[in-house]
């Protein structure tokens, strides 16, 4: 009888340990999941971030600040802008455009997330206009990469899997020409998508055109004209490409009022170039720029 009770006790303990082990594993599975943050966001909300980072950080950040000195729109008079002005170290320093380099790929990643979510099988499939907006922004950021860095990662960069991890940890280097090809393909796709419909209007999230697909379409054609002109010296048929430029221009903006202006700045949200000037006073008026304006009576 004593032996029976011992065996019974061991069996019960074993069963309980299995039960508690199972419960413990289930509990750990729940604990290990981040329930405090969303796992996915509607594409139209990501759009706001892509527009903002493109305008503020990528087009309006260090590129804008340093290039204004390099092309003599402004003069670097202090600290790093002085070194940029005198070409002592800033043009070749790996840290000069480090922040913008990271920003470009982060923005491109977000644009590609929108495109994937709005494509067939995605959680936002059917929102073709939103997809087209993201394709325009992806093209713009790809072209910034090509213009500023020449050969660079692009086709395999800024791609994530379903878990949010990079698809390629060491993406291949693309030729500058290949990056431009990708940008033009994005614009072709955008032109097709922007002429379709959205299931949900992104008006409130679109900080450029308040959901106006026609204006985004004009922006896409304007960028096609710009990038075709950028490539004219490598063109196999310049006359034909110039005809394309005229065609794209005819489908683009009719006045300055239609330009893609990121017009959200105020006293609390200042333009990054002005913010840099106020914080560091590193830029001064350019004599060359003044002379050109006087020459053209502008």
Functional labels for PLM-detected ranges:
Residues 1-21:
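Sec-dependent bacterial lipoprotein signal peptides
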Residues 45, 239-298:
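Hydrophobic-face positions in mid-chain alpha helices that act as interaction patches
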Residues 205-257:
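Aromatic- and glycine-enriched pocket-lining scaffold segments that form the walls
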Residues 55, 144, 148-151, 230-238:
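Alpha-helix C-terminal capping/termination sites
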Residues 23-72, 105, 121:
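Membrane-proximal, proline-rich intrinsically disordered regions
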Residues 79-152, 166-197:
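Conserved, well-structured interaction surfaces
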């Amino acid at each position: 009888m004593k032996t029976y009770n011992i065996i019974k006790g061991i069996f019960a303990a074993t069963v309980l340990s299995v039960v508690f082990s199972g419960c413990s594993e289930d509990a750990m599975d729940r604990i290990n999941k981040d329930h405090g943050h969303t796992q996915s966001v509607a594409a139209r909300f990501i759009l706001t971030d892509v527009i903002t980072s493109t305008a503020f950080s990528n087009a309006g950040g260090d590129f804008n600040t340093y290039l204004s000195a390099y092309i003599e729109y402004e003069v670097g008079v202090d600290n790093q802008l002085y070194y940029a002005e005198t070409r002592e170290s800033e043009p070749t320093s790996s840290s000069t455009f480090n922040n913008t380099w990271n920003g470009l790929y982060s923005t491109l990643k977000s644009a590609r997330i929108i495109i994937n979510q709005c494509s067939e099988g995605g959680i936002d499939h059917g929102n073709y206009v939103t997809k087209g907006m993201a394709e325009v922004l992806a093209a713009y950021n790809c072209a910034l990469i090509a213009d500023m860095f020449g050969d660079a990662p692009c086709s395999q960069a800024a791609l994530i899997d379903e878990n949010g991890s990079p698809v390629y940890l060491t993406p291949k280097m693309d030729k500058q020409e290949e990056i431009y090809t990708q940008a033009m393909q994005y614009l072709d796709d955008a032109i097709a998508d922007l002429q379709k419909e959205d299931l949900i209007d992104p008006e409130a999230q679109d900080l450029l055109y308040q959901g106006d697909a026609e204006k985004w379409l004009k922006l896409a054609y304007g960028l096609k004209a710009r990038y075709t002109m950028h490539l004219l010296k490598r063109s196999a048929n310049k006359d034909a490409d110039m005809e394309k430029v005229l065609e794209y221009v005819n489908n683009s903006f009719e006045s300055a009022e239609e330009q893609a202006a990121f017009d959200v700045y105020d006293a609390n949200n200042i333009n990054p170039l002005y913010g840099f000037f106020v914080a560091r006073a590193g830029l001064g008026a350019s004599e060359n720029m003044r002379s050109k304006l006087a020459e053209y009576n502008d």
